[in-house]
């Protein structure tokens, strides 16, 4: 007899042996215990399990596509977490949100501290605008704290103090007071709507209603309409400078906030800048409810019920992250009514360091303090016209700083109004209350607009983009990231070239690529995936039959391949693919093994004569359909750009260009498992993660205490009496003596100072610094998940991979234009046509230009040729234009002589037009170098000196600001900005990623000339 018992999805079998004293039954007796019930089993049969849908069957089985998909995406333990739905929230903000803007700027001088030359603020100016009530409160706080009013503009204040920490300390007090005032305003409104809290707090054992914990408030039945307050601290380039310099003074952000608020902070340092530094003080929203009708969301308009909390938000925003240009250029690009002034920074720095600065005969700062003769003469003439007496450098610096603040304030207003108009008219969301400052960067704004456009077109009727567009996660995230290949940048010629060089550039390469089809929908299950891969392999096996990029019978896919190149005489100096197998990204003609590619790359390789074999990989992904996901988004930007050109609206043109270029970058955002938190603001999930081993503390750093707000007790001297211990008899005698007061002089005899050499002891206490922050507020932890897998529900990273694959298809077609006639001729015997290439540009010789004018004529910009992919007439859509144009006749021009030393290190001597014989200055690029110290002749001299084995050393140096936010290096302190001298050596390319054909020409690695860095072994099975 057997007893079967089910437990947690498993079957446990217990055999009960037959007893000898009882007769045997003629049939087996089997029981099943399931859910506390006993069943008698009639028959038992062996079954099989379907690997595709998880069903059990005896002999034959037919599973549906729907069941296979569900099992693959939701049940299978290996693949169920590979793809996540992308969360969505409407683009706009709540229409009743009240906002206050604090726009500020600081001026600094150099201070030599323990960690090098640090920049210390001595002046801060800010201006206020926004909601009338909030603005009035902010002005009153400024006056109460004795900020000085700038007489030339209302609601503008400043503070001037060269002593260290004074400026930051006062600004900290002001921001703390703003936080307290705004949170108090929200709490009073919340309490007015819920007066029952006053009585409830006493029943719960609290003194004040504000002492009721946030978690307790969430369980109560609350009333009233939510209040949304936002305070923006804004500046230009403050995330890379001002906020770091002042951060030590403003890190204590919970001061004076009642326990009823839920306080959360989003702090993210990246690349030496503060990407996010947002604080939220939240209370429950009584009107919150789950949404059932999503029509409002399609229009980008959230309602009060969509917000789980009502809040006060404090956000730091950098206008540089929204404009990607200097304040002076932004003022011109956005047609602001005010202009940025000029300031002799070095003179100001010397004045505060040395107490003086050098002047000319008119007591005006000398010429070398100004950036150019023009700037020097203009500012001097303006000063002389004012006839305001002696030059007051402090007052001039104050006026300059205040004007910067006013320019930034006007820029903020212009950005808000212009982006709102863009969303209403160009995007077609007239009811959307869009606030560009709600998100910190142009990339995050472009991605939000893209998601809104997709949501409107697809109508998923849920709080995500649905299955139409998913995000790769965990194992699949790493697999997709392997298929993302960077750009191309290398010279195929080293040295001085006396031939004519034309520079051609792809027009809006990423924008054009984004209009092409991309994968959409939920990836196929393994069974259907195998059928699709079989179809791909059958087509790739037909070597002499080109594959159309837009063949709809071939589904979009990402897979692992091996690829073998054609004979070397049929290869080009522009390979179709690149590899990281050697440790560095290298464009190579070598055999490819185990490369993760998109199906577009497989087509590109196949059409260039490569033999492609798809490998069996469980992570292989096939999507059900092609869709032009971003075409509408790019089209509306192009339409806005054309409208701006017609209306001569520079602001609209700048917005459209920025949004168009930023979308690809948002797709390619790389996530990691690290997070930086302050010790006193560590959320519960991180505390639990550290305790259960999910997170590790990778590093801990402390903010430099020299920069902190503090109070100092000066040096203190105390003299102590060296009186010897009294005898017991003396003590007894004094105890018997009547006293009128227990605190008489007998208990503590007055000490009279005697001989300082013999009769006293003096202790000298060093100055004591009392910091205005707890130790936990100074400590930063960098936490990292122990698991290397990355959860992603934000970015469809595979779209970035396909964008780059489309650009490689563009360049491959460009290579066919240049080198189709040379196929079959060894590389060493070919005519020089191409000498340098960036991701979207090529430097061509005269022969290369002739081919572009003949075979590539259809790819030249002009004659209304399209830049946007047309789904009704599918073909690769890209155009190029000659960048070296004559400034006089606007015809194609060339450089008569050029020098190429290394990637991103070259110079064109001049730009000469053969039509009108006009000549203009050339072009010099030297990444990492101070280009003001370089010239064409210097690069030529450097090349010849190196070739002739000369001893002369060439280099450049420049002052650089080293920003440290969170550092694991002992010589770098968190939240400091130090000034360093960056020296770079100037020399020809040493560590090349190409092989040499002769003294000048280079070619990609191939099987006959393999990459010496590639030490990776590949497992191959021979049959």
Swiss-Prot record:
InterPro entries: DNA-dir_DNA_pol_B, DNA-dir_DNA_pol_B_adenovir, DNA-dir_DNA_pol_B_CS, DNA-dir_DNA_pol_B_mt/vir, DNA/RNA_pol_sf, DNA_pol_palm_dom_sf, RNaseH-like_sf. Its EC number is 2.7.7.7. One of its GO terms (cellular component) is host cell nucleus. Keywords: DNA replication, DNA-binding, DNA-directed DNA polymerase, Host nucleus, Nucleotidyltransferase, Transferase, Viral DNA replication. It catalyses: DNA(n) + a 2'-deoxyribonucleoside 5'-triphosphate = DNA(n+1) + diphosphate. Its main location: host cell. One of its GO terms (molecular function) is nucleotide binding. SUPFAM superfamilies: DNA/RNA polymerases (SSF56672), Ribonuclease H-like (SSF53098). One of its GO terms (biological process) is viral DNA genome replication. It is an enzyme of class 2 (transferase). Disulfide bonds: none annotated. Residues 726-751 are annotated as: Disordered. It is found in: Host nucleus. Eukaryotic-type DNA polymerase involved in viral genomic replication. DNA synthesis is protein primed, and acts in a strand displacement replication. Assembles in complex with viral pTP, DBP, host NFIA and host POU2F1/OCT1 on viral origin of replication. The polymerase covalently transfers dCMP onto pTP, thereby initiating complementary strand synthesis. This DNA polymerase requires a protein as a primer. Belongs to the DNA polymerase type-B family. Heterodimer with the terminal protein; this heterodimer binds to bp 9 to 18 of the genome. Forms a complex with viral pTP, DBP and hosts NFIA and POU2F1/OCT1 for initiation of replication. HAMAP family: ADV_DPOL (MF_04055). This is DNA polymerase. It comes from Bovine adenovirus B serotype 3.
């Amino acid at each position: 007899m057997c007893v079967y018992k089910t437990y947690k999805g498993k079957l446990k079998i217990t055999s009960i042996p037959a007893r000898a004293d009882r007769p045997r039954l003629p049939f087996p007796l089997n029981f099943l215990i399931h859910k506390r019930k006993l069943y008698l089993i009639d028959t038992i049969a062996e079954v099989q399990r379907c690997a595709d849908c998880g069903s059990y069957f005896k002999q034959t089985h037919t599973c549906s596509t729907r069941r296979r998909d569900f099992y693959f995406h939701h049940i299978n333990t290996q693949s169920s977490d590979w793809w996540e739905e992308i969360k969505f929230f409407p683009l706009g903000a709540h229409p009743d949100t009240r906002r206050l803007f604090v726009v500020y700027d600081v001026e600094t001088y150099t201070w030599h501290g323990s960690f090098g030359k640090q920049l210390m603020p001595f002046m801060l100016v800010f201006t206020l605008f926004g909601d009338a009530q909030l603005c009035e409160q902010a002005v009153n706080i400024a006056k109460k704290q004795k900020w000085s009013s700038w007489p030339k503009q209302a609601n503008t204040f400043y503070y001037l103090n060269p002593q260290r920490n004074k400026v930051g300390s006062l600004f900290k007090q002001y921001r703390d007071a703003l936080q307290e005032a705004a949170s108090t305003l929200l709490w009073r409104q919340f309490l007015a709507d819920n007066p029952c809290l006053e009585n409830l707090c006493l029943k719960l054992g609290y003194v004040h209603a504000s002492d009721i914990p946030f978690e307790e408030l969430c369980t109560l039945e609350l009333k009233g309409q939510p209040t949304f307050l936002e305070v923006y601290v804004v500046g230009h380039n403050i995330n890379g400078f001002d906020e770091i310099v002042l951060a030590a003074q403003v890190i204590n952000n919970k001061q004076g906030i009642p326990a009823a608020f839920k306080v959360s902070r989003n702090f993210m340092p990246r690349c030496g800048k503060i990407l996010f530094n947002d604080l939220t003080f939240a209370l429950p929203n009584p009107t919150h409810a789950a949404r059932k009708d999503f029509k409002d969301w399609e229009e980008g308009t959230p309602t009060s019920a969509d917000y789980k909390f009502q809040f006060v938000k404090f956000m730091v925003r950098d206008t540089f992250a929204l404009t990607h240009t200097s304040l002076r250029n932004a003022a011109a690009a956005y047609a602001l009514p005010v202009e940025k002034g000029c300031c002799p920074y070095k003179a100001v720095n010397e004045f505060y360091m040395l107490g003086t600065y050098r002047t000319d005969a008119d007591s005006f700062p000398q010429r070398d303090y100004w950036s150019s003769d023009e700037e020097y003469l203009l500012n001097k003439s303006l000063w002389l016209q004012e006839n305001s007496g002696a030059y007051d450098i402090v007052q001039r610096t104050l006026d300059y700083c205040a004007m910067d603040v006013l320019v930034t304030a006007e820029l903020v207003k212009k950005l808000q109004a212009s982006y709102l108009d863009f969303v209403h008219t160009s995007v077609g969301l007239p009811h959307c209350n869009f606030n560009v400052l709600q998100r910190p960067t142009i990339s995050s704004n472009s991605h939000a607009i893209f998601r809104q456009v997709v949501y409107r077109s697809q109508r998923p009727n849920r709080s995500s983009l649905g299955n139409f567009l998913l995000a790769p996660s965990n194992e699949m995230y790493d697999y997709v990231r392997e298929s993302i290949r960077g750009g191309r940048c290398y010279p195929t010629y080293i040295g001085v070239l006396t031939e004519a060089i034309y520079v051609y550039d792809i027009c809006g390469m990423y924008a054009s690529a984004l209009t092409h089809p991309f994968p959409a929908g939920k990836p196929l299950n393994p069974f259907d995936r195998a059928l699709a891969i079989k179809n791909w392999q059958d087509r790739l096996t037909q070597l002499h039959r080109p594959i159309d990029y837009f063949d709809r019978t071939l589904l979009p896919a990402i897979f692992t391949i091996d690829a073998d190149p054609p004979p070397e005489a049929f290869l080009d100096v522009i390979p179709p693919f690149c590899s990281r197998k050697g440790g560095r990204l290298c464009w190579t003609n070598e055999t490819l093994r185990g490369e993760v590619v998109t199906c577009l790359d497989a087509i590109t390789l196949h059409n260039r004569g490569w033999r492609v074999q798809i490998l069996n990989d469980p992570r292989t992904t096939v999507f059900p359909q092609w869709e032009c996901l971003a075409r509408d988004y790019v089209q509306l930007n192009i339409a806005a750009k054309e409208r701006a050109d017609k209306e001569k609206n520079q602001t609209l043109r700048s917005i459209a260009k920025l949004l168009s270029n930023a979308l690809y970058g948002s797709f390619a955002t790389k996530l990691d498992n690290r997070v930086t938190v302050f010790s006193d603001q560590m959320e519960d999930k991180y505390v639990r993660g550290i305790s259960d081993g999910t997170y590790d503390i990778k590093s801990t750093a402390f903010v430099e205490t020299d920069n902190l707000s503090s109070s100092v007790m000066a040096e203190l001297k105390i003299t102590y009496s060296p009186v010897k211990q009294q005898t017991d008899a003396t003590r007894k005698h004094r105890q018997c003596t009547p006293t009128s007061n227990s605190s008489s002089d007998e208990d503590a005899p007055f000490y009279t100072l005697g001989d300082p050499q013999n009769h006293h002891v003096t202790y000298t206490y060093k100055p004591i610094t009392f910091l205005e922050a707890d130790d936990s507020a100074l400590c930063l932890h960098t936490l990292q998940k122990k698991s290397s897998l990355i959860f992603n529900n934000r970015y469809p990273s595979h779209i970035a991979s396909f964008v780059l694959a489309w650009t490689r298809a563009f360049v491959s077609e460009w290579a066919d234009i240049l080198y189709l006639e040379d196929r079959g001729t060894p590389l060493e015997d070919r005519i020089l046509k191409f000498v340098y290439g960036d991701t979207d540009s090529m430097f061509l010789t005269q022969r290369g230009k002739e081919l572009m004018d003949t075979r590539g004529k259809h790819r030249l910009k002009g004659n209304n040729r399209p830049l946007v992919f047309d789904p009704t007439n599918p073909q690769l859509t890209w155009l190029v234009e000659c960048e070296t144009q004559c400034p006089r006749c606007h015809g194609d021009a060339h450089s008569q002589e050029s020098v190429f030393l290394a990637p991103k290190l070259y110079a064109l001597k001049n730009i000469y037009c053969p039509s009108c014989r006009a000549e203009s200055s050339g072009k010099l690029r030297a990444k990492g170098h101070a280009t003001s110290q370089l010239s064409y002749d210097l690069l030529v001299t450097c090349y010849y000196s190196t070739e002739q084995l000369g001893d002369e050393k060439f280099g450049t140096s420049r002052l650089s600001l080293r920003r440290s936010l969170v550092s694991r290096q002992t010589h770098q302190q968190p939240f400091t900005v130090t000034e360093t001298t960056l020296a770079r050596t100037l020399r020809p390319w040493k560590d090349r990623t190409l092989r040499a054909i002769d003294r000048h020409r280079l070619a990609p690695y191939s099987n006959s000339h393999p990459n010496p860095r590639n030490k990776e072994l590949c497992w191959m099975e021979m049959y």
